[in-house]
């Protein structure tokens, strides 16, 4: 049988941004997106896409201080927070999973991406020091990525010890 693509995709949304450019060493930006991302399969039914989180809100704030004999070096601190809807996933077909010889997780694609994990709050920070000279500059930085330890989900797997299906982080 030849493959036929009778599907269709649709993405709609709105973005808004509020930004303050560097003034007296302070800057910030707040942005938000509300969106809906769906596709229509060959069966004519509209489904969520895997990436349909529905919303993302970002906040960034930072401060810079000019240091050094001629105020040519920069000490910088910034913080970024992101709140976003959870990842989408398809429900697990337990019966098909248990029948699979390797217990590989099988998903119910008739309900594709109808489930959604909890919203995620992710935080990052940076502290840096930049040394500026006539023909060269150096920057030293410490970054904390996902410093709150938010888990992101990558799928599911069968746990042989417990006989249950676990989310993979």
Features from the language model and the residues they span:
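Extracellular beta-rich repeat passengers
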Residues: 57, 104-105, 116
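Gram-negative outer-membrane beta-barrel transporters
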Residues: 2-86
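C-terminal beta-signal and adjacent terminal beta-strands/loops
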Residues: 81-103, 120-122, 129-169
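Short amphipathic alpha-helical segments, especially helix-boundary/capping motifs
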Residues: 4, 33-38, 98-105, 153-154
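Alpha-helix initiation/capping motif
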Residues: 5-7, 50, 112-116, 168
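Extracytoplasmic loops and strand-loop junctions of Gram-negative outer membrane beta-barrel proteins
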Residues: 1-3, 40-45, 105-113, 160-165
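Short, glycine/charged-rich beta-strand-loop motifs at protein surfaces that mediate ligand recognition
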Residues: 110-117, 127-130
């Amino acid at each position: 049988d030849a493959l036929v693509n009778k599907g269709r995709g649709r993405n709609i949304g709105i973005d808004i941004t509020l930004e303050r450019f560097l003034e007296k060493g302070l800057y910030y930006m707040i942005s938000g997106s509300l969106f809906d991302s769906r596709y229509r399969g060959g069966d004519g039914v509209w489904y969520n896409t895997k990436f349909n989180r529905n919303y993302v809100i970002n906040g960034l704030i930072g401060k810079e201080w000019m240091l050094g004999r001629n105020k040519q070096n920069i000490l910088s601190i910034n913080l970024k927070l992101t709140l976003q809807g959870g990842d989408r996933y398809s429900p697990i077909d337990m019966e098909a999973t248990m029948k699979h010889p390797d217990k590989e997780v099988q998903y119910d694609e008739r309900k594709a991406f109808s489930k959604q994990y909890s919203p995620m709050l992710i935080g990052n920070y940076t502290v840096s020091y930049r040394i500026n000279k006539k023909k060269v500059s150096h920057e030293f930085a410490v970054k904390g990525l996902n410093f709150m330890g938010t888990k992101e989900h990558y799928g599911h797997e069968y746990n042989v010890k417990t006989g249950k299906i676990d989310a993979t982080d």
